[in-house]
């Protein structure tokens, strides 16, 4: 496949992760005039500069898209979207002039600058087009059939491992509480692979419960999943009086927007220890669960359980969502460890939608680097995931949250 044939990779603004719209609605109601900057980073250290022109063409195409009435009607059917926000979406489109693509340096540079509400929906389609352009050039003979064949093998192994009798309990694994969710929009091999993988899972895997992608949820009648991303917490670093108060402000503002829904909190914008210190009794009661996105999942889960137990909260009323570089095998091991104690779900992305024979996956991100003209940062529970353009600010952030350098 030649990249000149790829005009129109993204053909719906709903082809995005659900949490982007959830955050945009909260921004619409609470921070409509806040300015932000987001920047692209390729963790794989692969040279993507040759794709700059093709990426720019796709950006121009995306800027021509708007929400169709049937898409707005679908969003209106979800109880947490409000009428004023949906009215705003009727006239919404992404502005290509806010995106700067530069392939002249030593690596591909992409910067998005504008009002936070205007730029927040760029991330998922932008990363998806980068991955698909690269796939079409580097792996022109790989197809969705290859992805499905690989997926079938993994699913067979998953069920075989689940049936294996555990030496300690002398029983096989009961999968009745195993919830699998597609988190594969951003770094998928291609749109075609993503769609066919989700279709296969929906038809053949009872444990498959839904997708983070609103377009697929709408067109396949699947349950959508998603709450908020790191950028919600990052932005609040510059939307609060005291830096140390930013996490609690972000959590409380989320509850202000969604008091009775979307109650999963992401723990690792700073790190989990710092998060749990801020996650007081009221917040722990009101949020229905936590999401893991970096660091050791077992260690993280045990910390979460210990936190809930210290507050005398019934673990069966809470959920842990695992979403960090998961495979089906990793998810099964985590499930075996926690399922008898607390509700667990598993969001799997790249290992579902970009796992093809001979294909090396691309690890790319687009993260907020400024809010209101000042730096923001993500530290996380994993050193390789730190994202900040200002070392002095990073030091300040660590000090505010009592984190060792």
Curated annotation (Swiss-Prot):
GO terms for molecular function: nicotinate phosphoribosyltransferase activity. Coiled coil: none annotated. Pathway: Cofactor biosynthesis; NAD(+) biosynthesis; nicotinate D-ribonucleotide from nicotinate: step 1/1. The modification Phosphohistidine is found at residue 230. The keyword Ligase applies. One of its GO terms (cellular component) is cytosol. The keyword Repressor does not apply. SUPFAM superfamilies: Nicotinate/Quinolinate PRTase C-terminal domain-like, Nicotinate/Quinolinate PRTase N-terminal domain-like. Transmembrane segments: none annotated. GO terms for biological process: NAD biosynthetic process via the salvage pathway. Pfam families: NAPRTase, NAPRTase_N. Transiently phosphorylated on a His residue during the reaction cycle. Phosphorylation strongly increases the affinity for substrates and increases the rate of nicotinate D-ribonucleotide production. Dephosphorylation regenerates the low-affinity form of the enzyme, leading to product release. InterPro entries: N/Namide_PRibTrfase, NAPRTase_N, Nic_PRibTrfase, Nic_PRibTrfase-Fam, Nicotinate_pribotase-like_C. Keywords: Ligase, Phosphoprotein, Pyridine nucleotide biosynthesis. It catalyses: nicotinate + 5-phospho-alpha-D-ribose 1-diphosphate + ATP + H2O = nicotinate beta-D-ribonucleotide + ADP + phosphate + diphosphate. It is an enzyme of class 6 (ligase). Its EC number is 6.3.4.21. PANTHER family: NICOTINATE PHOSPHORIBOSYLTRANSFERASE. Catalyzes the synthesis of beta-nicotinate D-ribonucleotide from nicotinate and 5-phospho-D-ribose 1-phosphate at the expense of ATP. Belongs to the NAPRTase family. HAMAP family: NAPRTase (MF_00570). This is Nicotinate phosphoribosyltransferase. It comes from Photobacterium profundum (strain SS9). The gene is pncB.
């Amino acid at each position: 496949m030649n990249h000149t044939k790829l005009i129109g990779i993204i053909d719906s603004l709903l082809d995005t992760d659900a949490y982007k719209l959830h955050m945009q609605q909260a921004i619409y109601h609470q921070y409509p005039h806040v300015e932000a900057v987001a920047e692209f980073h390729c963790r794989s250290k692969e040279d993507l500069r040759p794709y700059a022109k093709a990426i720019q063409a796709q950006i121009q195409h995306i800027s021509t898209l708007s929400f169709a009435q049937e898409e707005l009607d679908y969003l209106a059917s979800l109880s947490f979207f409000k009428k004023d926000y949906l009215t705003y979406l009727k006239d919404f489109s992404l502005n290509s002039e806010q995106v700067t693509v530069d392939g002249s340096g030593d690596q591909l540079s992409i910067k998005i600058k504008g009002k936070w509400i205007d730029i927040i929906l760029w991330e998922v389609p932008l990363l998806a087009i980068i991955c698909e352009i690269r796939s079409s050039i580097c792996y022109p003979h790989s197809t969705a059939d290859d992805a499905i064949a690989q997926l079938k093998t993994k699913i067979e192994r998953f069920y075989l491992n689940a049936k294996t009798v555990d030496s300690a309990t002398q029983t096989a694994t009961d999968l009745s509480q195993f919830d699998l969710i597609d988190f594969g929009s951003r770094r998928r091999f291609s749109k075609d692979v993503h769609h066919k993988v989700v279709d296969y899972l929906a038809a053949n895997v009872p444990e498959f419960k839904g997708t983070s992608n609103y377009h697929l949820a709408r067109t396949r009648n699947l349950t959508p999943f998603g709450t908020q991303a790191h950028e919600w917490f990052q932005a609040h670093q510059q939307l609060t009086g005291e830096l140390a108060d930013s996490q609690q402000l972000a959590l409380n503002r989320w509850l202000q927007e969604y008091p009775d829904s979307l109650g999963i909190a992401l723990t690792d914008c700073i790190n989990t220890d710092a998060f749990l210190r801020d996650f007081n009794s009221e917040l722990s009661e009101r949020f229905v669960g936590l999401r893991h996105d970096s660091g050791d999942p077992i260690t993280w889960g045990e910390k979460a359980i210990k936190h809930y137990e210290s507050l005398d909260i019934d673990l069966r009323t809470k959920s842990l969502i695992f979403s960090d570089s998961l495979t089906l095998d990793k998810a099964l091991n985590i499930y075996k460890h926690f399922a008898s104690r607390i509700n667990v779900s598993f969001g799997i992305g790249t290992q579902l939608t970009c796992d093809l024979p001979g294909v090396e996956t691309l690890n790319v991100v687009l993260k907020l680097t400024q809010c209101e003209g000042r730096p923001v940062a993500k530290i996380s529970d994993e050193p390789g995931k730190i994202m900040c353009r200002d070392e002095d600010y990073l030091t300040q952030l660590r000090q505010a949250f009592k984190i060792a350098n």
